[in-house]
């Protein structure tokens, strides 16, 4: 079942999109009037931002300080799991050269060592 917050967001977007017909905008207005234009639900984006903030705090608690190369770039610190996943994917991707796989393995080991 579609997320109610996404449905509301879609109708709001339709109202502000100059490429949407007046007929479609009227349907969007009607839907928002009947169902409310505000929602107590959160969209995936909001959940993602909260998760990023939680992850950053958790990384700091685990000892990731300014000495860590990933802490210098806050977005990388927040997404350490994505960084690790990228290295793992490169190690198992048949289109990546052997040299690239070795390099990914070295970087993954470095990341794992720094997270201890």
Swiss-Prot record:
Chief site of localization: cytoplasm
Keywords for the protein's UniProt record, in alphabetical order: Cytoplasm, Nucleus
Domain of life, source organism: Eukaryota
Pfam families, per the entry: Con-6
Polar residues bias locations: 39-48
Subcellular location: Cytoplasm; Nucleus
GO CC annotation: cytoplasm; cytosol; nucleus
UniProt feature coiled coil, ranges: none
Segments of this protein annotated with the region Disordered: 32-116
Biased composition regions of type Basic and acidic residues, renumbered to the chain: 49-64
Annotated family: Belongs to the UPF0654 (con-6) family.
Name by which UniProt lists this protein: UPF0654 protein C869.09
């Amino acid at each position: 079942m579609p997320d109610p917050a996404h449905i509301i967001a879609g109708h709001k977007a339709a109202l502000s999109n100059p490429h949407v017909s007046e007929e479609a905008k009227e349907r969007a207005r009607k839907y928002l009037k009947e169902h409310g234009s505000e929602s107590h639900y959160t969209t995936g984006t909001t959940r993602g931002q909260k998760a990023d903030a939680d992850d950053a705090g958790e990384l700091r608690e685990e000892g990731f300080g300014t000495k860590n190369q990933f802490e210098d770039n806050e977005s990388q610190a927040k997404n350490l799991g994505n960084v690790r996943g990228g290295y793992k994917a490169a190690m198992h991707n048949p289109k990546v050269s052997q040299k690239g796989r070795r390099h990914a393995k070295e970087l993954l080991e470095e990341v794992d060592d720094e997270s201890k």
